[in-house]
């Protein structure tokens, strides 16, 4: 079952997602990537996180780009969830940044900058945006919020 559909408190969601951020950073430190770390692919019990449904085999050649994509997709999937506040999403990003290699965070930020034009191209559609597009808006806004703290 999709745990986001459960009636969890904000604090319970925060704990689960902070644990997931640490687990994703640990996965990346081991030279592994998920491919699409969506909320539905995260199992959690008593602080233990298990990722399921891996989408990609990591190759050394493009590992840094794959890690950056993993992190972006993880954040994007959080941003698509109406039930998650921007505060929780920013806390999760901070936790990943705290646990990852500094270059991994910088690679993700470089990817965001590379595709920034998409954000501006999509802004005129904000008033009619649905879940996927709102997720893109929130992704850029939350990353900017966390970047201000650097």
Enumerate the predicted regions with their spans:
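A short secondary-structure junction motif
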Residues: 2-3, 103
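Conserved kinase catalytic-core helix
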Residues: 3-40, 45, 49, 71
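C-lobe/activation-segment region of protein kinase-like
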Residues: 57-150
């Amino acid at each position: 079952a999709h745990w986001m559909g459960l009636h969890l408190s904000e604090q319970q969601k925060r704990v689960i997602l902070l644990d997931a951020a640490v687990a994703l950073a640990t996965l990346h430190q081991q030279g592994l990537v998920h491919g699409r770390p969506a909320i539905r692919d995260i199992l959690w019990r008593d602080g233990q996180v298990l990722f399921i449904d891996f989408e990609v085999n990591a190759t050394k050649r493009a590992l840094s780009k794959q890690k950056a994509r993993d992190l972006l997709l993880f954040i994007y999937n959080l941003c698509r969830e109406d039930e998650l506040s921007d505060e929780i999403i920013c806390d999760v990003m901070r936790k990943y940044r705290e646990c990852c290699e500094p270059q991994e965070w910088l690679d993700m930020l470089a990817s965001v900058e590379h595709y920034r034009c998409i954000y501006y191209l999509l802004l005129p559609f904000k008033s009619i945006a649905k879940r996927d597009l709102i997720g893109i808006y929130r992704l850029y806004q939350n990353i900017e919020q966390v970047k201000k703290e650097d």
